[in-house]
């Protein structure tokens, strides 16, 4: 896991997808063409937070290293340092795993 030279702004979060198993519990191998994109990932970087109506900074609940679940269509796919990552708002994250 290489350090990325990117700092998201405001309430945005950079997430690395966590690949799912290539085999089912019954031992059937799933080809790449039949796999869905994983909806679980690891937070790589997080912004400082959003501002409320009064202008006060509201920090994010997630931090680098957190394992998160997100919606199937959440985020924008980007390539940073040769690695495919997602940038999404914290509100697109459904929850923290563990």
From Swiss-Prot:
Q: Name one GO biological process term.
A: chaperone cofactor-dependent protein refolding
Task: Just give the chief location class.
Answer: cytoplasm
Which Pfam families does the record cross-reference, listed alphabetically? Cpn10
Provide the Gene Ontology terms for cellular component: cytoplasm
Query: Quick check: keyword Nucleotidyltransferase in the entry?
Result: no
Per UniProt, subcellular location reads as: Cytoplasm
Q: What InterPro entries does the annotation carry? A: Chaperonin_GroES, Chaperonin_GroES_sf, Chaprnonin_Cpn10_CS, GroES-like_sf
Q: Which keywords does UniProt give here?
A: Chaperone, Cytoplasm, Stress response
Under CDD domains, the record lists: cpn10
What induces or represses this gene? By heat shock.
Subunit annotation: Heptamer of 7 subunits arranged in a ring. Interacts with the chaperonin GroEL.
Q: What does this protein do?
A: Together with the chaperonin GroEL, plays an essential role in assisting protein folding. The GroEL-GroES system forms a nano-cage that allows encapsulation of the non-native substrate proteins and provides a physical environment optimized to promote and accelerate protein folding. GroES binds to the apical surface of the GroEL ring, thereby capping the opening of the GroEL channel.
Query: Per its UniProt record, what NCBIfam families does this chain match?
Result: PRK00364.1-2, PRK00364.1-5, PRK00364.2-2, PRK00364.2-4, PRK00364.2-5
Tell me the protein's name.
Co-chaperonin GroES
Q: Which organism is it from?
A: Brucella abortus (strain S19)
Gene encoding the protein = groES
């Amino acid at each position: 896991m290489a350090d990325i030279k990117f700092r998201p702004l405001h309430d945005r979060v950079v997430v690395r997808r966590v690949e799912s198993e290539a085999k089912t519990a019954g031992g059937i191998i799933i080809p790449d063409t039949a796999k869905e994109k994983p909806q679980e990932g690891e937070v790589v970087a997080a912004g400082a937070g959003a501002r409320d109506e009064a202008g006060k900074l509201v920090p994010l609940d997630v931090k680098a290293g957190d394992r998160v679940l997100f919606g199937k269509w959440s985020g924008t796919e980007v390539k940073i340092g040769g690695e495919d990552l997602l940038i999404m708002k914290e509100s697109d994250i459904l929850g923290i795993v563990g």
